[in-house]
């Protein structure tokens, strides 16, 4: 391909040669509506289940947190799991999830390039944070004593992966997407990923608060027992 020819793909850097690229046959709105509709249905189902299945009553904030972890389970296990298995054929594949990743890659082409960091990060996310997110939901519904430990572990892991995701692209000079584009850069790359900093950040502090309170109660109980023995 000569330098004066326009690339036959929508990805950055524009000089990329992607011989296997097959354009999506689904429009952008179809892909986004499909993704957010399924996520919305999952949120509604989790919200209803959290009031009917939980062994103890849960407050509004806790039920919303469970909705978040239910969506995380779907995204980590299904969407990111799909990428982990099929990243090498995304460019030519026309399955819905492959087209979703080709659409998202307009904001970060590292995904259709099978970038080493991205593949490893997404594989870890799918294998660890996906199942553990589901475990968080179950742990809170069953009122298991380690529920806040799970919440803390998953949330810290999500933040860590997201920070590395942003910093590696910053180090590369934001060359894998059109910098400043309202949809591809600001929505796909910035907003959709910043969510995994904000919400897990809140949940980290929430878990720390509950674990600290539990430890304080245990310490006070131990001190009372010791004082009685003295």
UniProtKB/Swiss-Prot annotation:
Regulation: Enzymatic activity is induced by 25-hydroxycholesterol, cholestyramine and lovastatin.
Residues with PTM N-acetylthreonine: 2
GO biological process, one term: cholesterol biosynthetic process
InterPro entries (UniProt xref): EBP (IPR007905), EXPERA (IPR033118)
Molecular-function GO terms, alphabetical: C-8 sterol isomerase activity; cholestenol delta-isomerase activity; cholesterol-5,6-oxide hydrolase activity; identical protein binding; steroid Delta-isomerase activity
Pathway: Steroid biosynthesis; cholesterol biosynthesis
UniProt xrefs under PROSITE patterns: EXPERA
Function comment: Isomerase that catalyzes the conversion of Delta(8)-sterols to their corresponding Delta(7)-isomers. Component of the microsomal antiestrogen binding site (AEBS), a multiproteic complex at the ER membrane that consists of an association between EBP and 7-dehydrocholesterol reductase/DHCR7. This complex is responsible for cholesterol-5,6-epoxide hydrolase (ChEH) activity, which consists in the hydration of cholesterol-5,6-epoxides (5,6-EC) into cholestane-3beta,5alpha,6beta-triol (CT). The precise role of each component of this complex has not been described yet.
Protein name as catalogued: 3-beta-hydroxysteroid-Delta(8),Delta(7)-isomerase
Organism from which the protein derives: Rattus norvegicus (Rat)
Organism lineage string: Eukaryota, Metazoa, Chordata, Craniata, Vertebrata
Gene that encodes the chain: Ebp
